[in-house]
Structure formats: C-alpha cells, structure tokens
Amino acid sequence: MIELIPAIDIIEGKCVRLTKGDYDTKKVYGNPLDMALQFEDMGMKRLHVVDLDGAKSKHVVNIDALKAITTHTKLTVDFGGGVKTDDDLERAFDAGATLVTAGSIAITDPERYLSWLEKYGAQHIILGADVRNGLVSINGWKEDSDVKLEDFLERYMKAGTKNVLCTEISKDGTLEGPAFKLYQTIMERYPDCHLIASGGVGSTEDILALDNIGIPAVVFGKAFYEGRINIAKLLETNNHKISTEGETKGTVC
C-alpha cells in the first residue's frame, strides 16, 4: 500500500506548479488553503507543502500559508523550502508542520542537519534528495553540488535518517512518468528507507506502478491539477489491500 501525498507548491502565497524546477514555467492553481481543504475532503491524510519563495531566497517565506493549512485542516503536513537555520526549522514546527524536509542544508552544513536529526528525531526530519544527472541539487534546484546521490544517501542513512524525499529533477512537472529505476535501486540498497518518490507522475497508473515495485510513498501535484489522477481509484486500491492483508493475517493455517 503506497502512501499518497498531494503537493502544494507556494509562490507569493499562491498554489503553483513548475516544470523541472524552472520558475519561468510557473502555472497558478489557486489558494493553498482551498486546495488543502479539497485534498482533505477527498480523503487525503498527508500533504507536502513547498515554499518555493523560501527555496529561492534561502529562508522560509510562506509561513502564514503553512499555518493556515495546519490550523484549518487535520492533514499531516510535511514542509520544505528555505529551511536553512535553526530558527527556520523551529518556525516551521511552530506553524504546525509535523515533518520538515531538509535537503540543501545537508550539503552545505552537514553538522547542522545531523543536529536536527538528533534533536527532533528521524520521524520528523525528511532528507531531501533532489537529483540531476546523478548529483544532488540545492537551493531550489538552482545549483548542482558535486555530491553523488549514492554517497549522499549512504552518509545520512548510516546516520539514522529514515525518511527520504527523492526528486528526479528532469522528470518533475513533465507528466512523463517517474524515475522507476532510480527509486527501485534506492529501495534495493536501503530496504528500511521510507522513500517518498517525487517527480514525473502523470497518471493513476504511474502511482499504481510505483506501488507494485514496493515504493512506500509518492508525492504528486501537477498530474492532479491537470485532471490526470483518479484519487478515488487510488484510495479504493489501498483500502482493498488493507482488507486483503487483514484477511490474510486472520487466516488460520
């Protein structure tokens, strides 16, 4: 059963989507709180919120939008974008985020990331692994580091990281399908990793295919906004799996 995580990306207080992280491709879809309420009404339990202004400016910007969502919904929210300092992190948690994604900081200030992991626990810190051409990208995907994805994951998985949000940048917003091989390779190497696949989802079938290869969770955004995802079908599939697993566990041999 794959965890379904709709995404809300925010620029200037509005819900938007980009293509391959290019801010010039911005498409506005409305008010973040309205979208969050819509996802909750559909039966979603989790929400991925990205402060794109924050990612670009290197500090959290859209904290009010986050607070509005956590105040007016019961969604479990993970938040990312511009979280670079202890104050940024504390503001995100104070605004109601249950989990915070930290990616760039794990490249630029590894000791700070590790201190957050120790202080808040692996259940509340998500390692953001945004990858382009095999290298980890930082600062809203505007810069490529010289760190290979496999080295990045190896270091922080050994340090106790459990949650990893991996985005294949070349796929993001294209609706052309996720990086199946990349995610499968990560899961084979780190079977205990709670991997959140992100980027390229273009249909309900893409999500079902990720589920079939054992990916624990998926973030989707543009595909939903463009009417390509049937959330009711996905929830029905998950509920059927829960029911089937329950029957299997209850069977006496």
Residue ranges and their predicted role:
Residues 3-7, 46, 74-78, 98-101, ...:
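Structural preference for beta-strand elements that scaffold enzyme active sites
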Residues 12-13, 17-23, 98-172:
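Conserved anion-binding
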Residues 112-120, 211-212, 217-220, 224-242, ...:
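C-terminal helical cap(s) of enzyme catalytic domains, especially alpha/beta-barrels
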Residues 4, 54-70, 84-90, 104-126, ...:
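Active-site-adjacent beta->alpha loops and helix N-cap segments on the catalytic face
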Residues 19, 133-145, 174-177, 185, ...:
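Active-site-adjacent loop and "lid" segments of alpha/beta metabolic enzymes
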Residues 22-40:
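Short catalytic helix/loop segments, enriched in acidic residues and glycine
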Residues 73, 77-99, 181-217:
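Catalytic cores of alpha/beta
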Residues 40-43, 93-94, 157, 211:
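Non-catalytic positions within long, well-ordered alpha-helices that form the structural scaffold/packing
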